[in-house]
């Protein structure tokens, strides 16, 4: 293959940066993650990184938007054609599957921390974007569940508890998870 045909396009690199940023921000938070670390994970120089994104905040916003989009994708794919309780059960099972993808859930948690910190510093750009994305996710869930704000609130609260337990490091076999119901129809092993 010619060397030029192996090169990634700027859009492919941008996608790589977003994926790498989600991992790094999930692990170290907004303030604890350097653009150098993200560039290294992607295999590009920092100057090239800044050709793709104007700065760290733009990278974080793109990663946060992707995180919310991927959460909806999980809900949407698992509950396609369903509404009401059937949709809630399907989406809940699918979200429990994300417990194994700690970076996805921790990116959500880091987003909330970053919003709080940016507002404390009187720089609300991250907060505005996060609230818009979260509201869109909430509304999509509300509609899929049948339109009730109460049902959507209960569903989202369930998800936040999952995020909290993951952030606290409870292993999946800990008794704290028992209230979430069986993930399969199989009987537990003796």
Give the residues covered by each predicted segment.
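Short, intrinsically disordered or compositionally biased N-terminal tails of bacterial proteins
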Residues: 1-4
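Generic detection of well-ordered alpha-helical segments
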Residues: 11, 15, 19, 65, ...
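Short alpha-helical scaffolding segments that buttress acidic/His motifs in well-ordered protein cores
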Residues: 95, 108-112, 155-159
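Hydrophobic/aromatic-rich alpha-helical bundle segments in the mid-to-C-terminal region
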Residues: 119-190
